[in-house]
C-alpha cells in the first residue's frame, strides 16, 4: 500500500509541475501553432528519468523512492497522450511538415535527453 501512495504522491507532484508549464508564455513557431510546451515537457521528463536511472545505477535508492520519482513524478509530468493528440491535430490541419518535425523532435530529443541525464549522473557521481 505504501508503494501505491508513493506513486500517487509523485503523480500528483508531476501533474502539478506539468500544469505550471502551461503558464510559460510559449511563442508560436511559424504560421502553425507548434506544440512546444508538450515537446519541452516530454524532453525534460525524459532527462529527469535518465537522471533517476543514473542515480539508481551509481548510488542506488530505495525501490519506493524509484516508484515515487520514476513512475509517479515522471509519469504524471510527461504527456504522451497529449503528444499523440497534438500530432493528429497538426495532420488534420494539413500541417504535415510541422507534424513530422514535432514527432521526430519528440522522439530524438526525448531519447537524447534520457541518455544525457544518465551520462550527467555518471560524471557527477564519478562513474564513467
Task: Cite the ranges covered by each PLM segment.
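Membrane-interface helix-loop junctions in multi-pass transporters/channels
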Residues: 1-128
Amino acid at each position: 500500500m505504501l508503494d501505491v501512495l508513493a506513486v500517487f504522491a509523485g503523480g500528483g507532484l508531476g501533474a502539478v509541475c506539468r500544469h505550471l508549464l502551461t503558464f510559460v508564455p510559449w511563442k508560436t513557431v511559424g504560421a502553425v501553432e507548434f506544440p512546444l510546451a508538450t515537446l519541452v515537457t516530454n524532453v525534460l521528463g525524459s532527462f529527469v528519468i535518465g537522471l533517476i536511472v543514473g542515480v539508481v545505477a551509481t548510488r542506488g535508492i530505495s525501490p519506493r523512492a524509484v516508484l515515487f520519482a520514476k513512475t509517479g513524478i515522471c509519469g504524471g509530468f510527461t504527456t504522451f497522450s497529449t503528444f499523440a493528440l497534438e500530432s493528429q491535430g497538426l495532420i488534420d490541419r494539413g500541417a504535415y511538415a510541422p507534424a513530422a518535425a514535432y514527432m521526430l523532435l519528440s522522439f530524438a530529443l526525448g531519447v537524447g535527453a534520457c541518455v544525457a541525464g544518465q551520462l550527467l549522473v555518471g560524471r557527477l557521481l564519478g562513474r564513467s
